[in-house]
Amino acid sequence: MNNLKEAIKQAEHIVFLTGAGVSVPSGIPDYRSKNGLYAGMSSPEYMLSHTCLVREPEKFYQFVTENMYYPDAVPNTIHRKMAEIEADKNVTVITQNIDGLHEKAGSKKVVNFHGSLYHCYCQKCGRSVSASDYLQSDIHADCGGVVRPDVVLYEEAISESAIDQSLAAIREADLIVIVGTSFRVSPFCNLTDYRNKKARIFAVNKERISLPYPFEMIENDAVKVFAEI
């Protein structure tokens, strides 16, 4: 932990790569753990697929609104500390999470790699729709089109904008910190392939992750680690 604290002090350009484990302490379940969102479900990937959205929009809407939204969740120590570090450093947060908690914590440079539940739009007219309106109905009041959250579903591609912003930040970073993710989902896990080779890499996760190049592993609860930074 002391090594990470010192690395953050010395770094000028920091990238945090965050996953579901960052939001679990805020009461938002991860996906695949024994207590995760998918536990006991027979076809959760289908429910969050483009096919389901197109073929069974009512079923998609019910699943998303009943299982994905946690509007009362608040940022935890990890989110807050990352935002705090941004006050003194050039920090970019690239997150797999779609819950908006990094922004709630005050982080300004956030790349929502898989989109955000709190950005919604009508598929018919393209206009933005508030998340609060979407939670009331998935039918756009203005044109009758079907509204969806701007998140990356199964069978959909990551946006070019998210990839471009991520690669620009990764290439500039002299410190990369992977937090709360097994770092196995592509293309998110491939981002570090484009790093500056002089950049230091740390990983903070309860379970050890594997990378094909040198990095420093902190196998611990990220809340405890960030509380001491």
Curated annotation (Swiss-Prot):
The alphabetized UniProt keywords are: Cytoplasm, NAD, Transferase
The reaction(s) catalysed by this protein are: N(6)-acetyl-L-lysyl-[protein] + NAD(+) + H2O = 2''-O-acetyl-ADP-D-ribose + nicotinamide + L-lysyl-[protein]
Catalytic residues, chain numbering? H114 (proton acceptor)
Q: Does the keyword NAD apply?
A: yes
Output the Gene Ontology terms for molecular function: histone deacetylase activity, NAD-dependent; NAD+ binding
Gene3D superfamilies given in the database record = SIR2/SIRT2 'Small Domain, TPP-binding domain
For the ligand (NAD(+)), the binding residues are: A20, R32, Q96, I98, D99, H114, T181, S182, N205, V223
Query: Which family is it part of?
Result: Belongs to the sirtuin family. Class U subfamily.
Q: What protein am I looking at?
A: NAD-dependent protein deacetylase
Gene source species: Listeria innocua serovar 6a (strain ATCC BAA-680 / CLIP 11262)
